[in-house]
Swiss-Prot record:
Entry superkingdom: Bacteria
NCBIfam families associated with the record: PRK13556.1 (NF010075)
Pfam family, one: Flavodoxin_2
Protein name (database record): FMN-dependent NADH:quinone oxidoreductase
Enzyme Commission identifier(s): 1.6.5.-, 1.7.1.17
Residues that coordinate or bind FMN: 17-19, 99-102, 143-146
Keyword Oxidoreductase: yes
Catalytic activity: 2 a quinone + NADH + H(+) = 2 a 1,4-benzosemiquinone + NAD(+); N,N-dimethyl-1,4-phenylenediamine + anthranilate + 2 NAD(+) = 2-(4-dimethylaminophenyl)diazenylbenzoate + 2 NADH + 2 H(+)
Gene that encodes the chain: azoR
Task performed by this protein: Quinone reductase that provides resistance to thiol-specific stress caused by electrophilic quinones. Also exhibits azoreductase activity. Catalyzes the reductive cleavage of the azo bond in aromatic azo compounds to the corresponding amines.
Cofactor dependence: FMN
Regions crossing the membrane: none
Species annotation: Staphylococcus aureus (strain bovine RF122 / ET3-1)
InterPro entries linked: Flavodoxin_fold (IPR003680), Flavoprotein-like_sf (IPR029039), FMN-dep_NADH:Q_OxRdtase_AzoR1 (IPR050104), NADH:quinone_OxRdtase_FMN_depd (IPR023048)
GO molecular function (one): oxidoreductase activity, acting on NAD(P)H as acceptor
Amino acid sequence: MAKVLYITAHPFNELVSNSMAAGKAFIETYQQQHPDDEVKHIDLFETYIPVIDKDVLTGWGKMSNGETLTDDEQMKVSRLSDILEEFLSADKYVFVTPMWNLSFPPVVKAYIDAISIAGKTFKYSAEGPQGLLTDKKVLHIQSRGGYYTEGPAANFEMGDRYLRTIMTFLGVPSYETIIIEGHNAEPHKTEEIKATSINNAEKLATTF
């Protein structure tokens, strides 16, 4: 039995968002095909994720020195630890994000910062940093209003490229994507684009 974290980063649901519609289709099909697997939904817009700020950095330093943390430091550090442990407990991750300003919503970066911890998800060595998530799988479902997979705007896309890069850095050997794009560039194709992405999601769910 595998544990899947279904991590969504969109303020709207599948009735409004193309990425959320594809994500819903994927996870429903996945659960049908893998009834014994555990799926946990994490809505990043409804989840408290402390940003790494002065309290967090100071708290980590105090922990290393065996010093007492303030209430705010303890609360933030403990919450980040809980997020990390939940992430480590899973076998597969499904990220669902829109493209915002060439990347993804800032809550995704906050989440990535929470789980990118030396000694837990990667380590330093004489040969350089080494990822520790060598038995995990990732799927990223991303919706883009324009066309960024190829063409003149391809080099501007920084969301999926960043997520792929950080997951590779953390040692993840399997990273797949479902890209939904072009519905703003060609509004008359919106329903076709959405239907294709849902079909792709349902197909991938059988083998992920």
